[in-house]
């Protein structure tokens, strides 16, 4: 989808990711259902003694929200390796919690923008899962580094193809847009058209398309409604 993304005064707040206990959940929005055992299998953790010998292996249940996210990722892209799908799901939960966003909303954006194709490149050059333009990605990476007291990032457009990096930048970007426009619908429109374009049209009382925001919000609502049935 074509974009004209521009710089925004993105700012973020820091809060730790927090997940709840395990619930069994099957995958959605695909003809084939994933087995409950497969998507909710507990994580094995091994305790070691001081000399490095294994003492005991304990099972830790996967958090409910993590299983939800994983089920969506695998339903859209069943060929993704399980380890990669879990990692993508973990990053979505971590960054959504950090920026006070619903992980299902981030999943909806990824579905509409790239259908979970981490190497997707649009005709205008937007890249990765959340389809970020390289110039916007460079600005966001530098902004994140400054907030952490680090030197400017060594950014390359190809770095947007990394799923974890792309999700971090895209979630940070949406958080900044929501703070700027004080409205989720406008934030989504700005994510698609660019904040400068949206602000200009608002100031000049000009119309702009809300099609992207409508599609994302419809997908988001479908995720919420479908997941509550399990």
Features from the language model and the residues they span:
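Catalytic glycan-binding domains that act on GlcNAc-containing polysaccharides
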Residues: 41-43, 47-48, 52-230
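Hydrophobic membrane-insertion alpha-helices, especially the h-region
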Residues: 18-34
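Membrane-interface motif at the C-terminal end of an N-terminal transmembrane signal
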Residues: 31-45
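N-terminal Lys/Arg-rich, disordered targeting/topogenic segments
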Residues: 1-14
């Amino acid at each position: 989808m074509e974009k004209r993304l521009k710089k925004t005064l993105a700012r973020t707040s820091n809060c730790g990711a927090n997940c709840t206990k395990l619930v069994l959940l099957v995958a959605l929005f695909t003809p084939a259902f994933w087995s409950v055992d497969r998507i909710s299998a507990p994580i094995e953790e091994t305790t070691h003694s001081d000399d490095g010998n294994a003492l005991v292996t304990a099972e830790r249940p996967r958090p409910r929200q993590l299983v939800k996210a994983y089920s969506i990722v695998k339903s859209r892209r069943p060929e993704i390796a399980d380890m990669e799908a879990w990692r993508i799901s973990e990053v979505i939960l971590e960054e959504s919690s950090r920026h006070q966003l619903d992980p299902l909303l981030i999943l909806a954006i990824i579905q509409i923008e790239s259908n979970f194709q981490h190497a997707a490149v649009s005709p205008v050059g937007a890249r990765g899962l959340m389809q970020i333009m390289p110039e916007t990605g460079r600005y966001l990476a530098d902004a994140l580094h400054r907030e952490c007291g680090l030197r400017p990032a060594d950014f390359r457009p190809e770095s947007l193809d990394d799923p974890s990096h792309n999700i971090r930048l895209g979630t940070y970007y949406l958080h900044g847009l929501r703070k700027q426009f004080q409205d989720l619908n406008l934030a989504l429109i700005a994510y698609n058209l660019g904040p400068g374009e949206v602000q200009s049209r608002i100031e000049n009382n000009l119309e702009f398309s809300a099609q992207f925001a409508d599609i994302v919000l419809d997908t988001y609502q479908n995720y919420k409604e479908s997941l509550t049935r399990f």
